[in-house]
């Protein structure tokens, strides 16, 4: 995926089409499980995280069962 990212202080715009989708994201140094396509875009823009090509290795076996919470799915209104 590749996204247009807003500048700091600009509105973070994203139409959420799948709030329950789960993704294992990785930057080479960090791995995290997040929920929602908008959170995936946010993590790409803010932290350079991309969808892992080896999710079971990067996020651990059973990563798909990670519960969706505000901590791993919420996005700010302003970037």
Swiss-Prot record:
Keyword Disulfide bond assigned: yes
Extent of the signal sequence: none
Post-translational modification: Contains four disulfide bonds.
Stretches of the chain forming a coiled coil according to its record: none
Chief localisation class: secreted
Tissue note: Growth-controlling neurosecretory light green cells, in the cerebral ganglia of the CNS.
One GO cellular component, as annotated: extracellular region
Induction and repression of expression: Its release and/or synthesis is stimulated during parasitic infection.
Subcellular location: Secreted
Alphabetically ordered keywords of this record: Disulfide bond, Secreted
Physiological role: Anti-gonadotropic neuropeptide. It also decreases the binding capacity of calfluxin to membrane-bound receptors of the albumen gland. This leads to inhibition of the reproductive activities of the infected snail.
Name this polypeptide is given: Schistosomin
Organism: Lymnaea stagnalis
Organism placement in taxonomy: Eukaryota, Metazoa, Spiralia, Lophotrochozoa, Mollusca
């Amino acid at each position: 995926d590749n996204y247009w990212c807003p500048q700091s202080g600009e509105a973070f715009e994203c139409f959420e089409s799948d709030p329950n989708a789960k993704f294992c994201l990785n930057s080479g140094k960090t791995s995290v499980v997040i929920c929602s396509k908008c959170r995936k875009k946010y993590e790409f823009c803010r932290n350079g995280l991309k969808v892992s090509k080896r999710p079971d290795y990067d996020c651990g076996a059973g990563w798909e069962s990670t519960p969706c919470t505000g901590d791993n799915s919420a996005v700010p209104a302003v970037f």
